[in-house]
């Protein structure tokens, strides 16, 4: 009886801990990463033609089922991203025996090169979102973060990102359709003063996530296709992911400090472009930086169910 009680106690404790928000502390640094738990569920992805600002690649609206995951409460900041770029704390990586989900040597993770120019472009570093990295660099950051913490992190799929952004809403924005309220939730071209702002300074959505509209647009894992939604018409699709087969274009979501209101809608999507490297002084162009994408950043997710090692590497750009 006592054994059964203890088993039930630990099982309940595991469930309670395993499906709550938490803070990931980066070993041997002052940095931390608050993570919000997102329950799995169904939602309608995309937008109707009647939605103000609708683009053709946002339809048809279709039903999607998403598994549970955690997502960063904030966009990744320079404070954290620069640890990856400088790699000064790699000597403190977790060993395999301390790793809960991943078993990789942090020294084996490819690191982004130090850029030739100051990549914040004078807009701010402390608690400001990191910008201008390529999708590969963002994915390698996720691999590095996984090695440092022992927990598996990756970029969100486009569907996961939109599910988290909407937070149960079915409107143009996660707070509704009243565009006059956008200034309370987002930094965009009308209020940003021509630069990004510190993360978390606007209202969060109903699930507690900040800056899903505006501040910086955000990378997802998917290859961009203007017709991908048509293939999901009139059926339920579980955890959709358009696996990349080429470098460009990849899906970017959320809109930024440079964008107008329509670009900040939950359904809005755009594809990346090699033109974002146009002013890159390196020859050949850098694998790690999009010098002309001063509007672009990312946030991370951690799936509730950790994938096998082979799939982890695929998510990290191998």
Segments from the language model and where they lie:
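Sec-dependent signal peptide recognition
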Residues: 2-9
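Hydrophobic h-region of N-terminal signal peptides that target proteins for export
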Residues: 10-18
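GGW-centered surface loops in extracellular recognition modules
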Residues: 20-37
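Short loop/turn microsegments at loop-to-beta-strand junctions
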Residues: 33, 151-152, 204-207
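Active-site microenvironments of metalloenzymes and redox enzymes
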Residues: 47-52, 65-175, 221-229, 302-318
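Surface-exposed recognition segments
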Residues: 51-64, 96-97, 169-170, 192-195, ...
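Chymotrypsin/trypsin-fold serine protease catalytic domain
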Residues: 170-196
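Short, well-ordered junction/capping motifs at the entry into regular secondary structure
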Residues: 186-213, 243-246
